[in-house]
Amino acid sequence: MSDNTKTNSRNKSVKRTKKVKKKKKFGFFKKLFTILFCLFILLSVAASGVIFAIVKTSPNLDINGTILNLDQPSQLYDDNNNPMDTVVTNQRRYVVSIKDMPKNLSNAFVSIEDERFYKHSGIDTKRILGAFYNDIKSKIHKQNSIQGASTITQQLIKNRMFLNDSLENRISFKRKIQEAYLSIKLEQSLSKSQILEAYMNTIFLGVQANGVEAASRQYFNKSAKDLNLIECAFIAGLAQSPSAYYPFSQNVAKNPNIYLDRTKLVLYKMRQNNYIDFSTYQNAINDLNNNKLAFSQQKISNKYTYEWFSIPVVNQVKQDLKSQYHYTDEEIDSLLRDGGLKIYTTMNTSMESNVQNILDNNSTLKSYSYADKNGIIQPEAAATLFDYHTGEIKAIVGGRGQQPPSSYNRADSSNYLRSVGSSIKPLTVYAPAIDTKLATEDTIVNDSPLSSDVAEKYGSNGVPYNPHNDDGGYSGPVNLKTALTKSINLVAIKLEDKLGLSTGAAYAQKFGLTLNNDDKSSIAALSLGEIRGSNTTTMAAAYGVFGNNGLYSEPRLYRKVVDKTGKVLLENNYSTRKVISPQSAYIMYDLLKGPVSAGGTGSYARFGDMPVAGKTGTASDSKNLWFCGLTPYYSAAVWVGNDQPTKLSLGSNDVAEIWGEIMKMANVNLTVKDIDAPGGVTKIGDSYYIDGTSPSNLSGDDSSSSTASKPQTPTTNTQNNTNNNVANPNSNNTTNSNTSNSTETPAQNTQQPTPTPTPSTNNTPGNTNTNTNTNNNTNTNTNTNNNNTNNSSSGNNNPPNNNTTNTNK
C-alpha cells in the first residue's frame, strides 16, 4: 500500500472519530439541556404552586372597611354637638378629599414615588423585578439594602393591610407577592384618584403626622390646600424616610441640605414628568436657594383643650365599653385612638370656659395667690356645675391657671379627695333626721357640751370626745333651722348620735358619697365632715337631690357614643334613684336657704333675685373650704385649698362668693322662679312640716314623753342615747305640761334652759318644758387633739380621732 493510500486511510479514520465525538458531545448537551429544561419546568411549576398558595392565603381585600375607611382619633362633641376635643394619641390624621389638595402635591408624590402610576395596573413590572432581584442579593449577602420600588398602590396596600408585618420583617417575599396580587385587585375596584387620595391620607410623614393634612399642619402650621410648590415638594420628599429629612432634628437643622437636596430632587422629577415647566422649576429652585422654605413648627401637645372634662369622659367611655362589650384594654385604646368614634358629651362649652375664668380671676383668690415650687398657682380651686334635672354635668374645672397635661383633676378625681367639713351635715344629719321623722325644722336641740356618757361613747383611748363650735361658745336651745344657718357643730353631733351612725352612713351612701369603714364608725366624720374625702362632682350631684324631689340623678358625662359607621355603641340615658321623700327634699331646700340668708355662713352666695340654697364647709383646721348648693335650675360645688394642705387665710364665705359668681353665670337669662312645694307638706308660720308631723308631737328632750311614732330609718341599727340632749319622741322619763317636749334640758346642769314658747296659731313648737334634770351635762374635758384632721390628698387615710376639738362651719 502506498504512503498516500495510508495517509488517506488515516485521515478518514480521524474524521470518523471526530464525527463520533461530535455526536457524543452533542448528545451530552442535548441531555443536559433536556434535564435543565425539565428542571426549569419543574421549578416553574413549583414556583407557580408556591405563588398560587401564597396568593390563595392572602387576606381579604376589604375596600370599604380597610382601604377607604381611614383611622382617625375619636372626636368629642359638646352639648350642642359642636366639636370640642380630639382624643389625645401619638398620631395625627385629618382626612381630606383629593379635591382639597393642591395639584402640585399629588403630582409631587407621583413623580418621586411612582412616576408610571397612571400607566400600570397596580404593579410596575420593571421596578418590581428590579426590587425582587435586589432583595435576593440582600438576603444572600446578609445585607439590609432595600430597594424601594413599590408602586403607590402597593404602598397603600402595605400601609393598610401589612403595616405591622412590614415593620417587623422588612424583607418578606410572601408579603410582596400578596401585596402585588392585592394591588392588582384594588386597581380593578378603585379609580386612580381614589387610590391616590387614600394613599395621601395614610402615608406616614414624620413624628405624629399621618397623611398630608397632618404633615402640613405639623411642618407649616397650615392646611394642605394652602401649600405652595416647594412646600408640596418637601412633604412628598419625606415619604422615603421621614426621620432622615425631619427639619427640626438637631442633625438636620445643622445641615439643611439634607432635606433641601431631597426637595430639589422632587422638583426635578416633576419637571422631568412634565408636571411643571422649566420656568416654574427654576423659580422653585431659586426659592429654595433663597431660604424661602419657611417652617412653622406646630407645638406637639398631648393635652386636651378641655382637659378637666375630656379626660373623665374618655375614662368613663373606656369603662362602659369594657363593661358592655368585654373589650380588652388594648382593644379599647385602639378603638379610641383609631376608631373615629364620636363621643357626644354633656359639657356646655360656654359654662366650662366661664367657670375656669371665674376660678382663675376671682379677686379674693388672686389676692392670696402664689406659685408653689412646681410653678402651680396656690391656693387651688375646683368646681362642678350639675343639671340635676337631667343628670348632665355641664362643667368640670379641676384647677386654676396653667396646668401641665394630666394634672390632678381636683374636681373629679378619686385620687384627690378632701374632707368636706360642715357641707356634709345636710346629707348625713339634717336630711336623715327630717326623712325619718326624727325631727322637724323647729325641733329644739340644746347647743351645749356633750353629756359625759355621750362624750365617753365616742372617746378614744380613754379620752372623752370633746367637740367645740367654731366660735368656742354655745347658744343653748335652738331649733334646726337656726342650727343649720349658723352651722352649729354640737347640734349636728347630737342629732347624729340620735340617728345612729349606721343610719347617717346609709344616707351618705345614698347621696353618692364614698365612705370607708373608719368614716362609717366616726361621729366626727358623719356629723362634721371629717371623712376621708370627696370632690366637687360628688357633692354637686348630692345637693341636686334637694331640688329634684328627693331623687338622685346619676351624673352623666356623655349622652352617647357612635362609631364611624353611625352605629350607636353606648347610650347613656338619664337615670335616678330615690334618696329621700319629695317632702323631705323640699324641707331641706327650705332649711338650706338659712345659711345663705343675712347672718348665715354663706350669705355671699346670693345673687340677684334667683332663689339659692346651700351650705358652707370648713374642714381640717381651715385647710379645705367648701360651698355646695343649688338653684331651681342647677346644683354646684366649689372647693378651695392648697395642694399641700396648709391653713388658708380665706373663709368659707369667700368660697360662697365664688359659688355665687358661677351660679350667676349659669342662671343668666333664666326665668326667676322657686321650687314648688310637693303635696304632703304643710307650712306653719315660716316653717314647713311633713303632713302628720307638727311641733307638738315631734319636739321634746331626752327625758320627755311623746306620742310621736318611732323614727323610720333606712337601716335597722339606730342608736338612742338618753343623754344626747336632742328631742327624743320615744323617751318617757320627764314631767311636762304637754305630751311632747320641744325644749331640751342639759343633763346635770344647774342652768335652766330657756323654754320653748307656746305656739300661737301653730307657728312655733308648742311645748314648754319644766324638766329640771340635774344630770351634769357640762363636760370639762378640754382635749384639743387634732388627730381627727384628715388630709387625704397627702396620703393620710388614718381614721378620724373622735376626741378632736372640731371647729367646722
From Swiss-Prot:
<keyword id="KW-0378">Hydrolase</keyword>
<keyword id="KW-0472">Membrane</keyword>
<dbReference type="GO" id="GO:0005886">
    <property type="term" value="C:plasma membrane"/>
</dbReference>
<dbReference type="Pfam" id="PF00912">
    <property type="entry name" value="Transgly"/>
</dbReference>
<keyword id="KW-0808">Transferase</keyword>
<dbReference type="InterPro" id="IPR023346">
    <property type="entry name" value="Lysozyme-like_dom_sf"/>
</dbReference>
<dbReference type="Pfam" id="PF00905">
    <property type="entry name" value="Transpeptidase"/>
</dbReference>
<feature type="region of interest" description="Transpeptidase">
    <location>
        <begin position="381"/>
        <end position="664"/>
    </location>
</feature>
<comment type="pathway">
    <text>Cell wall biogenesis; peptidoglycan biosynthesis.</text>
</comment>
<protein>
    <recommendedName>
        <fullName>Penicillin-binding protein 1A</fullName>
        <ecNumber>2.4.99.28</ecNumber>
        <ecNumber>3.4.16.4</ecNumber>
    </recommendedName>
</protein>
<keyword id="KW-0735">Signal-anchor</keyword>
<feature type="topological domain" description="Cytoplasmic">
    <location>
        <begin position="1"/>
        <end position="34"/>
    </location>
</feature>
<comment type="similarity">
    <text>In the C-terminal section; belongs to the transpeptidase family.</text>
</comment>
<keyword id="KW-0573">Peptidoglycan synthesis</keyword>
<dbReference type="InterPro" id="IPR036950">
    <property type="entry name" value="PBP_transglycosylase"/>
</dbReference>
<feature type="region of interest" description="Disordered">
    <location>
        <begin position="694"/>
        <end position="809"/>
    </location>
</feature>
<feature type="region of interest" description="Transglycosylase">
    <location>
        <begin position="74"/>
        <end position="251"/>
    </location>
</feature>
<keyword id="KW-0328">Glycosyltransferase</keyword>
<feature type="active site" description="Acyl-ester intermediate; for transpeptidase activity">
    <location>
        <position position="422"/>
    </location>
</feature>
<feature type="active site" description="Proton donor; for transglycosylase activity">
    <location>
        <position position="113"/>
    </location>
</feature>
<keyword id="KW-0961">Cell wall biogenesis/degradation</keyword>
<comment type="similarity">
    <text>In the N-terminal section; belongs to the glycosyltransferase 51 family.</text>
</comment>
<keyword id="KW-0511">Multifunctional enzyme</keyword>
<keyword id="KW-0046">Antibiotic resistance</keyword>
<dbReference type="GO" id="GO:0046677">
    <property type="term" value="P:response to antibiotic"/>
</dbReference>
<feature type="transmembrane region" description="Helical; Signal-anchor for type II membrane protein">
    <location>
        <begin position="35"/>
        <end position="55"/>
    </location>
</feature>
<dbReference type="InterPro" id="IPR050396">
    <property type="entry name" value="Glycosyltr_51/Transpeptidase"/>
</dbReference>
<comment type="function">
    <text>Cell wall formation. Synthesis of cross-linked peptidoglycan from the lipid intermediates. The enzyme has a penicillin-insensitive transglycosylase N-terminal domain (formation of linear glycan strands) and a penicillin-sensitive transpeptidase C-terminal domain (cross-linking of the peptide subunits).</text>
</comment>
<dbReference type="GO" id="GO:0009252">
    <property type="term" value="P:peptidoglycan biosynthetic process"/>
</dbReference>
<dbReference type="GO" id="GO:0008360">
    <property type="term" value="P:regulation of cell shape"/>
</dbReference>
<dbReference type="GO" id="GO:0009002">
    <property type="term" value="F:serine-type D-Ala-D-Ala carboxypeptidase activity"/>
</dbReference>
<feature type="topological domain" description="Extracellular">
    <location>
        <begin position="56"/>
        <end position="809"/>
    </location>
</feature>
<dbReference type="InterPro" id="IPR012338">
    <property type="entry name" value="Beta-lactam/transpept-like"/>
</dbReference>
<keyword id="KW-0133">Cell shape</keyword>
<keyword id="KW-0812">Transmembrane</keyword>
<keyword id="KW-0121">Carboxypeptidase</keyword>
<dbReference type="GO" id="GO:0008658">
    <property type="term" value="F:penicillin binding"/>
</dbReference>
<dbReference type="GO" id="GO:0071555">
    <property type="term" value="P:cell wall organization"/>
</dbReference>
<dbReference type="GO" id="GO:0006508">
    <property type="term" value="P:proteolysis"/>
</dbReference>
<keyword id="KW-1133">Transmembrane helix</keyword>
<dbReference type="InterPro" id="IPR001264">
    <property type="entry name" value="Glyco_trans_51"/>
</dbReference>
<dbReference type="GO" id="GO:0008955">
    <property type="term" value="F:peptidoglycan glycosyltransferase activity"/>
</dbReference>
